Amino acid sequence: MCRTVNGADINAEPGVNPQTKDGRGNLAPVTIIMPTLAMEAGGDIEKFFEILDQKIHEAKEMLLERYEFMCAQSPDSAKFMYENGTMSGYKPEEGIRSALKHGTLVIGQLGLAETLQILIGKDHTTKEGMELAKRIEQLFKDRCAEFKKAEHLNFGVYYTPAENLCYTAMKKFKDKYGEIENVSDKDFFTNSIHVPVWKKVSPLEKIDIESQLTSYSNAGCITYVELESTCKNNLEALEQIVNYAMDKDIPYFAINVPNDTCLECGYTDEFNDKCPICGSEHIQQLRRVTG
């Protein structure tokens, strides 16, 4: 899965470093759509936490059921995964459970920013919003740690990409609750813990905000920033941004840069309907729209 990170393996074989990443991965995700829970709680913060805690436990049960289903499959269902060491630890006499037990069952989330707007009328670009955001993320982290110990399986907090879910979840939300300012007045929910794309923050400010939450995830997250196309010619500035993200302990960082090409004259830059050089409308526009 995109942005996968593997934490310590509770089922590491004797003599194998539990922090080993090779041959492991996230097995299955369940994503909790938090704005819906905030609405069900009527905007009451403590009620929201009660509902969220219940949903996290339900997510665990769903993942355990999926895990057992996967373990019941024949190695032939994905022969290349087990017989060439792509998934490490496979022992034919024990079945594919011997390999899958080293993977991670992940609990993801969608719409932190919108959830905070429902609960307190602010998102995590504010001090009050960040305080509540950290409390929410701590609950995910604590529960996954408890599940890992109790079930002797790797559970982790995952900041879901939600490429399609962010749209389908919003459509269902609007059908039920209508359009709410700063919550459902867009066509999508904000992915996981990201700063909403309409917020006017600099790349470094975005890193500052999201870096306060990435440590709560031990199964995968990403922080990315969008820059103007001219930055491609300023490697020193790009390096400064990357170094800043690393200094903030961002585990997975990406930079989005618009890239438009005229297919007639070959001019490359950032432009819209037509090439500013030759006027051709035969252009290719590339944008990274997820992350």
Residues of each region from the PLM?
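Conserved catalytic cores of very large enzyme subunits
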Residues: 1-101, 122, 126-284
